[in-house]
């Protein structure tokens, strides 16, 4: 999709950015989440987000099978929609087994989820106003439905300060689901490959770093 990918001189840099730098960036997302933010929401929004993420990922797998795509593609797209858009797509793609269409699937998912997220940033505040949601309800809706963090911030604060704050917290809670989702994927891959000579890692290192940085961020004021 990008002519630079065909340039031999660019490939090492692209490969570095798509692997090591990407995983470091995903791990650093953990610094944006604090336990105080989560507890401030209350248990109902937290439970709703957790259930929604699980259902969305599983729905992606089911719909992929229905349309003749692989479960890996369903996991990739479902995870991107459920968690944090392009960042989740690239993180999940980096731990899924590689196949001839891996790059195509990842590129499609990133482009599609970014386009839909931008469209949602523009249209969802109008939907919120049409349904007359209060600031908290609007924040939960925007943070729980828009894919990427930046678009959630843009949509939320275009409504009000309180809506933006709530939307951001809800969205970061979804980002926090990246760790358990990656863990679940790692467990499935580990079990499926346990009988082969090369067993898949139970949990990718950047997911462990993500969890550690969440704990560190909870103790620091950045």
Show which residues each predicted segment covers.
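Structural signature of multi-pass alpha-helical membrane transport proteins
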Residues: 1-18, 28-37, 183-222
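Cytoplasmic-side transmembrane-helix entry/capping segments in multi-pass membrane proteins
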Residues: 12-26, 45-50, 70-81, 104-112, ...
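Entry/N-cap segments of selected transmembrane alpha helices
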Residues: 24, 29, 33-61, 107-118
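Helix-coil boundary and interhelical linker segments in multi-pass alpha-helical membrane proteins
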Residues: 35-44, 100, 126-138, 157-166
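Transmembrane alpha-helices that form the ion-translocation and gating core
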Residues: 47-80, 120-132, 220
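Hydrophobic/small/kink-forming positions within alpha-helical transmembrane segments
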Residues: 54, 118, 122, 149, ...
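Alpha-helical membrane segments and immediately flanking helix-loop junctions
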Residues: 69-119, 137-160
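Oxyanion-binding "anion nests"
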Residues: 156-204
């Amino acid at each position: 999709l990008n002519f630079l990918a065909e340039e031999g001189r660019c490939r090492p840099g692209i490969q570095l950015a798509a692997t090591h730098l990407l995983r470091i960036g995903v791990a650093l997302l953990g610094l944006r989440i604090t336990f105080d933010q989560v507890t401030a929401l209350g248990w109902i929004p937290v439970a709703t987000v957790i259930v929604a993420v699980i259902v969305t990922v599983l729905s992606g797998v089911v719909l992929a099978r229905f349309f003749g795509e692989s479960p890996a593609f369903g996991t990739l797209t479902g995870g991107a929609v459920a968690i944090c858009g392009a960042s989740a797509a690239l993180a999940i793609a980096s731990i899924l087994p590689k196949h001839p269409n891996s790059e195509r699937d990842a590129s499609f998912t990133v482009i599609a989820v970014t386009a839909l997220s931008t469209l949602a940033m523009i249209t969802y505040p109008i939907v919120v106003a049409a349904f007359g949601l209060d600031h908290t309800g609007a924040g939960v809706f925007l943070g729980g439905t828009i894919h990427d963090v930046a678009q959630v911030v843009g949509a939320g604060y275009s409504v009000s300060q309180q809506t933006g704050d709530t939307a951001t917290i809800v969205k970061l809670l979804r980002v926090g689901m990246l760790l358990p989702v990656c863990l679940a994927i790692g467990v499935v891959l580990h079990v499926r490959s346990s009988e082969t000579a090369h067993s898949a890692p139970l949990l990718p290192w950047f997911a462990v770093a993500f969890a550690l940085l969440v704990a560190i961020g909870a103790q620091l004021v950045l």
